[in-house]
Amino acid sequence: IGLESTILDMTVSPPMILRPGAITADMLEEVIGVVSVDETILGSESSQAPKAPGMKYRHYAPKAKLTIVEGSLKEEVFAIRQLAYEKSRQGVQVGIIGTNETVEFYTHGLVKNIGSRENEKTIARNLYRVLREFDDEKVDIIYSESFAMQGIGSAIMNRLEKAAGHLRISASAVVKQQRYRRVIFVSNTDSYIGPMAAELLRNKELEQ
């Protein structure tokens, strides 16, 4: 499927997944019962060294800095759009890893369609190819959407995490930092404008 195979440690009880791949935890449990997962592949850095080969260091990492943007899909798209816009204005060559469902919403940067979220095998198969293409096109920074930590998605996120050196940012944090320079009030009468403005200022949603 484009990613390395699943590695399962059968010397412990319950058996432990050391590297996620096309054979998912659900598939294994249907055959051998309960399996555990090595904590070093659960999406965060650990003080313990990974047991599986090729899992300790940035694996198949692109030359450009790769950042995973995490949140709801809507938040991720909004955040990546904003980040790409800001970096592009600074003359930075931006790469974006998007999907069938989102690529049309990105207006700045070099956008790569990694596949449909409804077909995770396609995403897994395209991941390393897309990273290599960004190398060939000499982008400076890459922003990637995140994927569900279920099924093959866990393997996709594991490889993305390794390639990014565990660099992740919150999409909602980027959205909150968005500055609004103009607010248009629409009202049938002037009596509503004052309370509307006061409520906005009370909530401190605007950065002056």
Q: Can you say where each PLM-predicted feature lies in the sequence?
A:
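Active-site-adjacent structural elements in enzyme catalytic cores
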Residues: 1-182
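Conserved active-site segments centered on acidic
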Residues: 177-208
